[in-house]
């Protein structure tokens, strides 16, 4: 098995952010259910960059927790590159606090969620959302974290 993570910290302050080993662990927990070889870039950004990218690519003028940009190889070329995840530090921290979740659990959830998007999963239709939520919960719980959707299910 070969997984590769290119981690980019593009934040003013990196204090308190999870280690590269943690990001690698979370990525591998999600991707290895589907394929043994994979490459990903995870870029940790501040609000300004998240908001600019969310506006440009989704038409939403606000920061968001995670954006996924799948890599589309030209025909005839096979690469293990899944794509890029852009995760906004401040949004993740605010959401974890609002949802009363441990911060590392929410970081792990964002990596798993984004990786599933890169693997082709989505949550636009109800049926797809249920499948994606099931996978996220299964992966997160295997890592020892609580169900990320527990509060919504109560």
Swiss-Prot record:
Binds 1 zinc ion. Signal peptide: none annotated. Keywords: Cytoplasm, Endonuclease, Hydrolase, Metal-binding, Nuclease, Ribosome biogenesis, rRNA processing, Zinc. GO terms for biological process: rRNA processing. Zn(2+) binds at residues 113, 117, 123. GO terms for cellular component: cytoplasm. InterPro entries: MetalPrtase_cat_dom_sf_prd (IPR023091), YbeY (IPR002036), YbeY_CS (IPR020549). It is found in: Cytoplasm. It holds the Pfam family YbeY. PROSITE patterns: UPF0054. It is an enzyme of class 3 (hydrolase). It comes from the Bacteria. One of its GO terms (molecular function) is RNA endonuclease activity. The keyword Hydrolase applies. Its main location: cytoplasm. Its cofactor is Zn(2+). Its EC number is 3.1.-.-. Single strand-specific metallo-endoribonuclease involved in late-stage 70S ribosome quality control and in maturation of the 3' terminus of the 16S rRNA. Belongs to the endoribonuclease YbeY family. HAMAP family: Endoribonucl_YbeY. This is Endoribonuclease YbeY. The lineage of its organism: Bacteria, Pseudomonadati, Pseudomonadota, Gammaproteobacteria, Vibrionales.
């Amino acid at each position: 098995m070969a997984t590769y993570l290119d981690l980019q910290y593009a934040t003013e302050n990196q204090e308190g952010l999870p280690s590269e080993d943690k990001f690698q662990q979370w990525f591998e927990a999600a991707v290895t259910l589907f394929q043994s070889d994979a490459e990903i870039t995870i870029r940790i950004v501040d609000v300004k960059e998240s908001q600019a990218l969310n506006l440009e690519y989704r038409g939403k003028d606000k920061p968001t927790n995670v954006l996924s940009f799948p890599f589309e190889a030209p025909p005839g070329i096979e690469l293990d590159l899944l794509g890029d995840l852009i995760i906004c530090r401040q949004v993740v921290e605010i959401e974890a606090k609002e949802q009363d979740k441990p911060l590392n659990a929410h970081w792990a959830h964002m990596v798993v969620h984004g990786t599933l998007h890169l693997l082709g999963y989505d949550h636009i239709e109800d049926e797809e959302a249920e499948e994606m939520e099931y996978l996220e919960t299964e992966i997160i719980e295997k890592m020892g974290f609580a169900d990320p959707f527990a509060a919504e299910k109560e």
